[in-house]
Amino acid sequence: MSSTPAAGSAAEVATSSATSNAPSAPSTTASNVSNTSQPTTAGTPQARGGRGSNANGGASGSNAGGGDEPRKEAKTTPRISRALGTSAKRIQKELAEITLDPPPNCSAGPKGDNLYEWVSTILGPPGSVYEGGVFFLDIHFSPEYPFKPPKVTFRTRIYHCNINSQGVICLDILKDNWSPALTISKVLLSICSLLTDCNPADPLVGSIATQYLQNREEHDRIARLWTKRYAT
Protein backbone atom coordinates (compact mmCIF):
# COMPACT_ATOMS: atom_id res chain seq x y z
CA MET A 1 0.00 0.00 0.00
CA SER A 2 2.89 2.38 0.71
CA SER A 3 4.54 1.85 -2.73
CA THR A 4 1.77 3.58 -4.69
CA PRO A 5 2.49 7.14 -3.50
CA ALA A 6 6.21 6.61 -4.12
CA ALA A 7 5.55 5.66 -7.71
CA GLY A 8 3.32 8.68 -8.17
CA SER A 9 5.99 11.00 -6.76
CA ALA A 10 8.65 9.53 -8.99
CA ALA A 11 6.49 10.08 -12.05
CA GLU A 12 5.90 13.70 -11.10
CA VAL A 13 9.64 14.27 -10.54
CA ALA A 14 10.49 12.66 -13.87
CA THR A 15 7.92 14.78 -15.70
CA SER A 16 9.16 17.96 -14.05
CA SER A 17 12.79 17.10 -14.81
CA ALA A 18 12.03 16.33 -18.44
CA THR A 19 10.28 19.67 -18.84
CA SER A 20 12.98 21.78 -17.17
CA ASN A 21 15.93 19.98 -18.76
CA ALA A 22 14.45 19.56 -22.22
CA PRO A 23 17.57 20.83 -24.12
CA SER A 24 19.62 17.96 -22.75
CA ALA A 25 17.20 15.33 -24.01
CA PRO A 26 17.75 15.03 -27.78
CA SER A 27 14.74 15.20 -30.16
CA THR A 28 12.09 15.17 -27.39
CA THR A 29 10.98 18.79 -26.98
CA ALA A 30 10.37 21.85 -29.10
CA SER A 31 13.13 23.71 -27.27
CA ASN A 32 15.60 20.95 -28.16
CA VAL A 33 14.49 20.99 -31.80
CA SER A 34 15.13 24.70 -31.84
CA ASN A 35 18.62 24.20 -30.44
CA THR A 36 19.57 21.27 -32.62
CA SER A 37 18.28 22.85 -35.82
CA GLN A 38 21.22 25.30 -35.73
CA PRO A 39 24.24 23.16 -34.78
CA THR A 40 26.70 25.38 -36.62
CA THR A 41 25.34 28.85 -35.74
CA ALA A 42 27.44 29.27 -32.61
CA GLY A 43 27.61 32.96 -33.32
CA THR A 44 24.00 33.60 -32.12
CA PRO A 45 23.72 35.58 -28.87
CA GLN A 46 21.96 32.67 -27.12
CA ALA A 47 24.70 30.21 -28.01
CA ARG A 48 27.74 32.44 -27.41
CA GLY A 49 26.67 35.13 -24.98
CA GLY A 50 29.67 37.39 -24.20
CA ARG A 51 31.85 35.67 -26.77
CA GLY A 52 29.76 37.19 -29.56
CA SER A 53 30.95 40.67 -28.57
CA ASN A 54 34.52 39.44 -28.15
CA ALA A 55 34.55 38.31 -31.74
CA ASN A 56 33.96 41.90 -32.84
CA GLY A 57 35.97 43.95 -30.37
CA GLY A 58 37.48 41.58 -27.82
CA ALA A 59 40.65 39.53 -27.79
CA SER A 60 39.38 36.99 -30.29
CA GLY A 61 38.31 39.76 -32.69
CA SER A 62 41.76 41.34 -32.40
CA ASN A 63 43.44 38.05 -33.17
CA ALA A 64 41.16 37.44 -36.12
CA GLY A 65 41.78 40.87 -37.60
CA GLY A 66 45.55 40.98 -37.00
CA GLY A 67 46.39 37.31 -37.33
CA ASP A 68 48.07 37.73 -40.72
CA GLU A 69 50.66 40.23 -39.49
CA PRO A 70 52.38 37.89 -36.98
CA ARG A 71 52.41 35.19 -39.63
CA LYS A 72 54.17 37.55 -42.06
CA GLU A 73 56.72 38.43 -39.41
CA ALA A 74 57.28 34.76 -38.74
CA LYS A 75 58.05 34.25 -42.42
CA THR A 76 60.36 37.23 -42.94
CA THR A 77 62.26 37.25 -39.66
CA PRO A 78 64.14 34.00 -40.34
CA ARG A 79 65.41 35.41 -43.65
CA ILE A 80 66.78 38.49 -41.91
CA SER A 81 68.25 36.37 -39.13
CA ARG A 82 69.95 34.10 -41.64
CA ALA A 83 71.41 37.10 -43.48
CA LEU A 84 72.70 38.60 -40.25
CA GLY A 85 74.00 35.23 -39.17
CA THR A 86 75.93 34.73 -42.41
CA SER A 87 77.52 38.17 -42.37
CA ALA A 88 78.28 38.07 -38.65
CA LYS A 89 80.02 34.71 -38.91
CA ARG A 90 82.07 35.91 -41.86
CA ILE A 91 83.06 39.15 -40.13
CA GLN A 92 83.99 37.29 -36.94
CA LYS A 93 86.14 34.92 -38.97
CA GLU A 94 87.93 37.81 -40.68
CA LEU A 95 88.40 39.58 -37.36
CA ALA A 96 90.14 36.52 -35.94
CA GLU A 97 92.36 36.28 -39.02
CA ILE A 98 93.36 39.94 -39.14
CA THR A 99 94.06 39.92 -35.40
CA LEU A 100 96.40 36.94 -35.69
CA ASP A 101 97.97 37.92 -39.02
CA PRO A 102 97.42 41.59 -39.91
CA PRO A 103 98.55 42.97 -43.28
CA PRO A 104 101.85 44.90 -43.20
CA ASN A 105 101.46 48.42 -41.78
CA CYS A 106 97.74 47.83 -41.14
CA SER A 107 95.41 47.06 -38.26
CA ALA A 108 91.64 46.90 -37.99
CA GLY A 109 88.91 45.96 -35.56
CA PRO A 110 85.38 46.79 -34.36
CA LYS A 111 84.38 50.04 -32.73
CA GLY A 112 83.24 48.93 -29.30
CA ASP A 113 80.70 46.11 -29.47
CA ASN A 114 79.43 46.83 -32.99
CA LEU A 115 80.71 44.04 -35.22
CA TYR A 116 79.60 45.89 -38.36
CA GLU A 117 81.49 49.14 -37.67
CA TRP A 118 85.29 48.97 -37.70
CA VAL A 119 88.14 51.41 -37.52
CA SER A 120 91.42 50.76 -39.32
CA THR A 121 94.89 52.24 -39.10
CA ILE A 122 97.29 52.35 -42.05
CA LEU A 123 100.88 53.51 -41.71
CA GLY A 124 102.18 55.44 -44.69
CA PRO A 125 104.16 52.98 -46.83
CA PRO A 126 107.93 53.35 -46.52
CA GLY A 127 109.45 55.21 -49.48
CA SER A 128 106.15 56.86 -50.40
CA VAL A 129 105.16 60.50 -49.97
CA TYR A 130 102.95 59.30 -47.11
CA GLU A 131 105.78 57.73 -45.11
CA GLY A 132 105.63 58.63 -41.44
CA GLY A 133 101.90 59.28 -41.52
CA VAL A 134 99.23 57.43 -39.55
CA PHE A 135 95.95 57.28 -41.44
CA PHE A 136 92.65 56.30 -39.85
CA LEU A 137 89.85 54.75 -41.86
CA ASP A 138 86.23 53.83 -41.15
CA ILE A 139 84.93 50.46 -42.32
CA HIS A 140 81.23 49.69 -42.52
CA PHE A 141 79.93 46.18 -43.24
CA SER A 142 76.36 45.79 -44.44
CA PRO A 143 74.16 42.80 -43.47
CA GLU A 144 74.67 41.59 -47.07
CA TYR A 145 78.44 41.21 -46.58
CA PRO A 146 80.34 39.42 -48.14
CA PHE A 147 77.99 39.56 -51.12
CA LYS A 148 78.28 43.34 -51.09
CA PRO A 149 81.57 45.18 -50.53
CA PRO A 150 82.35 46.99 -47.31
CA LYS A 151 82.29 50.78 -47.30
CA VAL A 152 85.79 52.08 -46.53
CA THR A 153 86.57 55.78 -46.12
CA PHE A 154 89.55 57.80 -44.91
CA ARG A 155 89.01 59.80 -41.73
CA THR A 156 92.46 61.37 -42.01
CA ARG A 157 92.94 63.96 -44.74
CA ILE A 158 95.28 62.86 -47.49
CA TYR A 159 96.53 64.42 -50.72
CA HIS A 160 95.78 61.71 -53.27
CA CYS A 161 94.17 61.72 -56.70
CA ASN A 162 92.12 58.60 -55.88
CA ILE A 163 90.83 59.80 -52.49
CA ASN A 164 88.63 62.87 -52.22
CA SER A 165 88.09 65.35 -49.38
CA GLN A 166 85.24 63.23 -47.94
CA GLY A 167 87.57 60.25 -47.67
CA VAL A 168 85.90 58.30 -50.47
CA ILE A 169 88.29 55.89 -52.17
CA CYS A 170 88.26 55.18 -55.89
CA LEU A 171 89.19 51.50 -55.86
CA ASP A 172 87.70 48.97 -58.25
CA ILE A 173 87.39 46.14 -55.70
CA LEU A 174 85.20 48.38 -53.56
CA LYS A 175 82.83 48.80 -56.48
CA ASP A 176 82.17 46.66 -59.56
CA ASN A 177 85.12 44.30 -59.11
CA TRP A 178 84.15 43.19 -55.64
CA SER A 179 83.98 39.44 -55.03
CA PRO A 180 82.80 37.50 -51.96
CA ALA A 181 86.17 35.76 -52.07
CA LEU A 182 87.86 39.04 -51.08
CA THR A 183 88.44 39.95 -47.43
CA ILE A 184 88.99 43.16 -45.52
CA SER A 185 92.67 42.25 -45.22
CA LYS A 186 92.96 42.19 -49.01
CA VAL A 187 91.10 45.49 -49.22
CA LEU A 188 93.58 47.12 -46.83
CA LEU A 189 96.49 45.71 -48.81
CA SER A 190 95.02 47.20 -51.99
CA ILE A 191 94.66 50.58 -50.30
CA CYS A 192 98.30 50.43 -49.19
CA SER A 193 99.29 49.68 -52.78
CA LEU A 194 97.23 52.67 -53.91
CA LEU A 195 99.21 54.89 -51.53
CA THR A 196 102.43 53.63 -53.04
CA ASP A 197 101.27 53.90 -56.65
CA CYS A 198 98.27 56.09 -57.35
CA ASN A 199 96.11 55.63 -60.44
CA PRO A 200 95.87 58.97 -62.28
CA ALA A 201 94.08 57.25 -65.18
CA ASP A 202 91.00 56.77 -62.98
CA PRO A 203 91.09 59.77 -60.64
CA LEU A 204 88.58 60.91 -58.09
CA VAL A 205 90.26 64.32 -57.86
CA GLY A 206 91.14 65.39 -61.40
CA SER A 207 93.32 68.36 -60.44
CA ILE A 208 95.63 66.23 -58.30
CA ALA A 209 95.86 63.63 -61.06
CA THR A 210 96.83 66.32 -63.58
CA GLN A 211 99.44 67.69 -61.20
CA TYR A 212 100.80 64.19 -60.62
CA LEU A 213 101.27 63.73 -64.36
CA GLN A 214 102.50 67.22 -65.24
CA ASN A 215 104.32 68.40 -62.12
CA ARG A 216 105.28 65.40 -60.05
CA GLU A 217 107.72 67.32 -57.87
CA GLU A 218 105.08 69.79 -56.72
CA HIS A 219 102.60 66.98 -56.22
CA ASP A 220 105.00 65.10 -53.97
CA ARG A 221 105.87 68.23 -52.00
CA ILE A 222 102.22 68.94 -51.20
CA ALA A 223 101.51 65.28 -50.40
CA ARG A 224 104.36 65.22 -47.87
CA LEU A 225 103.19 68.51 -46.41
CA TRP A 226 99.66 67.18 -45.92
CA THR A 227 101.02 63.99 -44.38
CA LYS A 228 103.02 65.98 -41.86
CA ARG A 229 100.14 68.34 -41.14
CA TYR A 230 97.22 65.91 -40.88
CA ALA A 231 98.65 62.43 -40.32
CA THR A 232 101.36 62.88 -37.70
From Swiss-Prot:
A Pfam family that the UniProt record links to this protein: UQ_con
GO biological process, one term: lipid storage
Assigned GO CC terms: nucleus
Keyword line: ATP-binding, Nucleotide-binding, Transferase, Ubl conjugation pathway
Catalytic activity, as annotated: S-ubiquitinyl-[E1 ubiquitin-activating enzyme]-L-cysteine + [E2 ubiquitin-conjugating enzyme]-L-cysteine = [E1 ubiquitin-activating enzyme]-L-cysteine + S-ubiquitinyl-[E2 ubiquitin-conjugating enzyme]-L-cysteine
SMART domains for this protein: UBCc (SM00212)
Enzyme class, first EC level, given as a word: transferase
Species, as recorded: Drosophila melanogaster
Designated name of the protein: Ubiquitin-conjugating enzyme E2-24 kDa
